[in-house]
């Protein structure tokens, strides 16, 4: 068997799932569609005279498709690896795997490769499509080989990162959020190094060579160039691309080695292990009955000596559930008999007959540590308890590090007189906003998938909670747990207004628009968590939708500008956006299709395209109106069925069955 039975099982059953064939077919069709539309844009706006024009087209097309494939591969490899392990933890099946005869390496490596199988199959299926780029000219087979080597090494490293973090963290949100934050931090740090802000050269290597040797994005940029110059300082490695391949393999070996060594130390975590509290054991009912135990219980505030003496009178050691023979001369009350004369005054009700049951307060003394639940228990649990683990603070600290990098870069550019609105300033702020949207969406979808995998959702459905209490409670918990991710980027916007980079009108547009997008991301996560019973499908669909709406549309516009240089040649890409809207409708309306969700699915990509176009044309008010109208309508279209007629257990409407 290949790397143990876990991976062998996935290899055996994966071809039986239609998802394997649908995924690789859609990805290849996407690449072919982009290639065709790019050709239509080129021939519709420019005159192709000779082979040189074809070669330049092939080179530019190859680079853009390579960047797109790397972004998708890195994102989904890390996400699928983390969610696969987190799902095993939520369903308590990882403990069962630990009880088997599987070795640590078979468990860790088998689960890692099983989660990456779909990504690897999709990459292999894309090889013939990229070979077509060589037919245009300007692309060599060495470039294609280097590009795929960098992509596969990045997939292995990012998947190992997600798997290791998921084995370490005990909650799904912690695993997904930490994976995303580490990836962004990895790319951001080496992106800063590539600009020369840290150093120009070190140990004989330029800053660009160091960045290409340690960053997947910088490595793919270097690998897609026609000629890669060798660096004498690297010696036998030769080029920064070879250095990156070595670094990626070393990172994968290191992460998997740590995971193999620590998997049985980390799991099961302390939070999932049952803990027997001493107070609960003390209050355990003895063989003499609850009435006798209530009369023998020490009063509140009693010292440890009084508790020990009380336990001796009952014949049991303090703090244990064991029963021993009573001490000689001790008064023992038989079940149903009268209370002994040694009972303190006030411990029994004088108006109660000897045969009646004791008062409830006498049987269950009030615990001063008891907490009162709010009217909405869902939001109380989200806010007042450690519902997502005590180590969620690490996620917040990691985000604060990234926020400090963005804020520091903006302050440095403002101090040096660099424009904060265009160029690097807007890119840093946009990346921070996108990261915040991804984290808010991840918090929302994992709040539902964790309940479902932990079998707690069934208990909530049989309670007297209304759909509004459940949905609003989850949304309130999402914004509370991600308050740093929501508030801090908005404070940066206020700083830009204070620095004079934004007017008051633009600040209002930005804050209101971002608030609408936050609401959309949170509601999208709740909607996907309700619609999909499989946690990995829910997380992948939810985060993939955010990825498509913002980065996918931006990539289409980048391709359009690369081949035409103007906005007039938009018609071919409108077909691609409509195609994406159809896929979005299938993803969002899989369980609860409606006309509102259908309209929103086709409107969001078009409106995002229109908003970016309006921004480039300095028509900020049109971009604001389009974003607020489209994403606000989509949020309401997902919210209304959830609080009115949506059955979170089955993912379908139940009004027609009543």
Tell what function each PLM region has:
Residues 1-77, 83, 118, 122, ...:
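Transmembrane alpha-helical segments and their membrane-interface loop/helix boundaries
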Residues 7, 84-116, 379-383, 387, ...:
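Helix-loop-helix units of permease transmembrane domains in multi-pass membrane transporters
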């Amino acid at each position: 068997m290949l790397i143990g039975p876990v991976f062998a099982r996935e290899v055996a059953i994966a071809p039986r799932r239609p998802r394997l064939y649908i995924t690789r077919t859609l990805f290849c069709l996407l690449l072919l569609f982009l290639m065709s539309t790019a050709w239509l844009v080129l021939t519709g706006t420019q005159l192709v005279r000779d082979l040189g024009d074809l070669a330049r087209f092939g080179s530019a097309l190859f680079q853009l498709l390579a960047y797109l494939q790397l972004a998708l591969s890195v994102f989904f490899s890390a996400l699928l690896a983390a969610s696969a392990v987190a799902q095993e933890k939520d369903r308590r099946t990882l403990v069962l795997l630990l009880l088997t005869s599987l070795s640590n390496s078979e468990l860790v490596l088998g689960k890692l490769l099983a989660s990456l199988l779909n990504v690897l199959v999709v990459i292999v299926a894309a090889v013939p499509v990229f070979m077509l780029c060589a037919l245009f000219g300007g692309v060599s087979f060495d470039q294609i080989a280097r590009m795929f080597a960098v992509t596969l090494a990045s997939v292995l490293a990012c998947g190992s990162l997600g798997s290791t973090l998921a084995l370490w963290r005990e909650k799904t949100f912690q695993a997904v959020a930490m994976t995303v934050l580490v990836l962004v931090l990895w790319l951001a740090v080496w992106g800063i190094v590539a600009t020369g802000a840290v150093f120009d050269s070190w140990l004989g290597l330029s800053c660009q060579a160091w960045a290409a040797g340690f960053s997947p994005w910088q490595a793919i940029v270097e690998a897609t160039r026609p000629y890669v110059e060798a660096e004498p300082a690297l010696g036998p490695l030769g080029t920064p691309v070879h250095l990156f391949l070595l670094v990626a393999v070393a990172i994968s070996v290191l992460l998997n080695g740590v995971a193999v060594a620590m998997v049985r130390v980390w799991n099961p975590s302390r939070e999932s292990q049952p803990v027997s509290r001493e107070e609960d054991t003390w209050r355990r009912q003895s063989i003499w009955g609850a009435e006798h135990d209530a009369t023998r219980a020490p009063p509140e505030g009693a010292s440890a000596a009084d508790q020990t003496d009380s336990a001796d009178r009952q014949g049991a050691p303090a703090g244990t559930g064991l029963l021993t023979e009573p001490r000689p001369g001790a008064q023992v009350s038989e079940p149903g008999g009268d209370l002994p004369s040694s009972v303190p005054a006030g411990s029994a009700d004088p108006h109660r007959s000897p045969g009646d049951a004791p008062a409830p307060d006498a049987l269950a003394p009030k615990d001063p540590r008891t907490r009162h639940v709010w009217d909405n228990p869902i939001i109380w649990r989200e806010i007042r308890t450690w519902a997502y683990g005590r180590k969620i603070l690490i996620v917040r600290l990691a985000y604060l590090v990234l926020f400090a990098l963005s804020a520091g870069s903006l302050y440095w550019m403002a101090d040096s007189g660099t424009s904060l609105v265009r160029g690097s300033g807007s890119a840093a702020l946009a990346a921070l906003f996108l990261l915040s949207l991804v984290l808010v969406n991840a918090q929302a979808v994992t709040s539902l998938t964790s309940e479902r995998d932990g079998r707690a959702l069934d208990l909530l459905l049989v309670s007297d909670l209304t759909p509004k209490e459940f949905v609003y409670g989850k949304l309130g918990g999402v914004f509370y747990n991600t308050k740093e991710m929501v508030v801090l980027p908005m404070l940066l916007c206020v700083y830009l207004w204070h620095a004079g980079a934004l007017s008051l009108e633009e600040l209002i547009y930005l804050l209101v628009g971002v608030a609408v997008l936050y609401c959309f991301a949170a509601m999208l996560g709740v909607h996907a968590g309700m619609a999909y019973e499989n946690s990995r499908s829910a997380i992948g669909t939810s985060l993939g939708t955010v990825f498509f709406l913002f980065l996918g549309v931006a990539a289409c516009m980048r391709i359009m500008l690369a081949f035409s240089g103007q906005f007039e040649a938009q018609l071919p890409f409108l077909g691609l956006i409509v195609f994406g809207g159809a896929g979005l409708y299938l993803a969002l309306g899989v369980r609860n299709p409606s006309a509102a969700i259908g309209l929103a699915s086709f409107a969001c990509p078009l409106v995002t395209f229109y908003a970016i176009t309006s921004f480039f044309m300095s028509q900020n008010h049109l971009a604001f109106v389009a974003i607020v109208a489209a994403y606000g309508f989509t949020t309401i279209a997902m919210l209304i069925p959830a609080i009115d007629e949506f059955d979170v257990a089955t993912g379908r409407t139940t009004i027609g069955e009543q």
